[in-house]
Amino acid sequence: MRKSSRMLAAAAALALAAPASADTVCEWMELAGRLGAAAQASPTPQTADQVRATTRTALAIFEAVNSIDRRYQSYLNLPAGDSAASQDAAAATAAYQVLLHHYPAQRSQLEESYALAMAGIADARAREAGRAIGEAAAAAANQAGGVDPALPQTPYRPRTRPGEWIGASLPSLEPYWGALRPWVVQSPDALRPPPPVALTSQRWARDYEEVRRLGGRTSTERTPHQTLVARYRQAFDTMPSMRLIADAPGRTPVQNARMFAVYQMAFDDAAQAMVVAKLQYNFWRPITAIRNGDADGNDATQPDPNWVPLLPTPNFSEYPCGHCTVAAAIAEVMTAEVGNRPRGGVRIMSLAIPNSVVQAFPRWDAWAQEVSDSRIYGGVHYRFSNEAGEQIGRRAARMVLDRALQPLPRRRGSR
């Protein structure tokens, strides 16, 4: 996972980050994303607090800016603030305080970035008023979305027959996932998909055969483009699209802050439901199923004891597809924000390929579909699992869009 290089890159970015006034929301959200990626790549497992860091940052920025330019309902029930306060100061302070809370080891770099951001705000009274608003928003956000102490945190237990060997590496899914408080969804179970298809069904045989043919390392049926897609989509970065949207004429800081907050809340709620379902169903990956195709009770599946996937198999259960879940959630949120065919296209980078260029898609749904397809080309998921994940993502996003950060009625004469 290129842990060392990601951590060095994040440290360098911290040292250089000085959010510009016009891009305060994007700059701090991009910084939050880099810190989150470095924490995820670290050999030390993320804490429950850290998996909420990026969303808390987005929520704190939104609440701070929305307190000054009151356009939407407050998620954290914060009162309206001084309308003359600096929105840049409020956003920078909110982000800084949240990131410092979650990544104390980065204090010196964060302090430098924050000092540079605040130094660019000339109006001292507006700056200090914004600082106070940002501090209040961060304090509230840091308490939101955490672990519910009333819910158990059950460690994963490998399932096998007594006396039979099983791989000793535990899945990289921490016990706290099921105990986190969702942002909007009532509980992860509200989005739980139906069980995987029956192993004796025609659907199982069809999807088994698809991944066997297209997802193997030595596949002769997968095209060179499909191979590139599998590698490129292992880790994606939507920030080029977010920046393009945020920079559009007429966009306001509070609109941009809300966009990031809704995006992150939908991402989190979809991801949590997906992880809980994975642990519940414990379904086998293609590398296991295809090598044991004679053990599934289906005469239409033929075993291949030498089959290996194109991509490394993630160290946790298969169903439902995680990439498919979050990509569908993102596409649903962004379609609601700017339409399915945004001006300038859907611009995505890859975090899996060093120095990758930005790729443009015409539509959000086309990008999300390619993410889903890429997991089959990579040999790590089945089509029915992709579809289950897509459904989770869309439902989670729709719930967040319908229930959180709703526009307030505008008073007559207001702009």
Give residue spans per PLM region:
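N-terminal signal peptide c-region/cleavage motif recognized by signal peptidases
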Residues: 17-20
